[in-house]
Amino acid sequence: VLFRSNARKYAINWDKKSKSDIQFRVKQFIRPYWGRDIVFEELRVVGTRLSLDFYNANKKIAIEVQGKQHQQFNKFFHNNNRANWLDQLKRDDLKLKFCLTNGIKLVEIYEDDEISIDLFSKFEVYL
């Protein structure tokens, strides 16, 4: 069992706002491609503090939307503590390893990325 048994509560609501504006933009971009698939948002991974921003169960594709705090220390997001930033980097690495181990393609989208089909094809992911 990879995900919590109550995974249904994480089923995506395509119209509901997301944690961030960019995450909502990604959701709206993938909707025409994934609208008929089984898709979850903020899906928790069993036995960890990890969650996946989006997970398509039909295609075994996860999407992580990475804000600037995933690329550099940010006093606000990391509570003015560099150890918190290092912990975040470790969690990001754990997500990558989790996905690799379980045959899940992971697409990481950063704030500055142009959300497009070309972006997904760089990860060899075809929507």
Task: Name each region found by the language model.
Residues 1-127:
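Nucleic-acid endo/exonuclease domains
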